[in-house]
Amino acid sequence: SQETILTLLAAVGANNVPGLCMSFMNGHVDTIKAYGEIVFKTPLTSDKRLYLLAAKDSHDLPGLFFALQNGHADSIRMFGSLLNKKMLSSEQIKELLKVKHGLFMALQNGHTKAIMAYGDILKILPPHQEYIDELLWIKNPNGTSGLFMAFYNGHTETIRAFCNILKNYSFTTRRLVEMLSATNKDGIPGVFVSVVNRDKETILEYCRIIKENN
């Protein structure tokens, strides 16, 4: 039965973490590729296929979250190539890419290549603003922007990579200002932190980004 197949393919360990999730955590690209190909070749309903590819742990965190958090760019790209097989709807792909806190962690940790890889996967989706807004409007539960954390930690190249993703889409002026302001929970913009820290490189990069978006 499909339920039996689902249980076997999920390969959940003693810690309630699916095997695919562990592969994302550890950056095992070849395993992700092999597993994804098996999932697409196995006769499953779309919701069961979605369940397996999300590979969520016991805290409901998907495998892609851990790849972003840990900076496994090649794993993210491999996942993107699997999603690009045209066997999933845009809505299903969007569900698999809803890893806001993962992108937040990638910005905070300065995982530039991982963010670039995620941006490449987004190109699979139609460029509807509601899709992109939902995936890139990144704040933690207390309201601090992921981009603010990149400023806070001086991750200049990471800021550039994320803003290059924004350039691929047409945002309203108001939304773009909100995103680029990169505020924390108190409304303090990220560039303010760069000024306080005398982070000249990040300030200059931010000025270039603002100029490009005018």
Feature names for model-found ranges:
Residues A11-V12, L53-K56, K100, K139, ...:
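Ankyrin-repeat boundary/linker signal
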Residues L9, L52-L53, L97, E134-L136, ...:
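Ankyrin-repeat inter-repeat connecting loop/turn
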Residues T4, D30-A34, D74-M78, A114-A117, ...:
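Conserved ankyrin/ankyrin-like repeat signature
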Residues N26, I38, T42, L82, ...:
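Residue-level signature of the C-terminal ends
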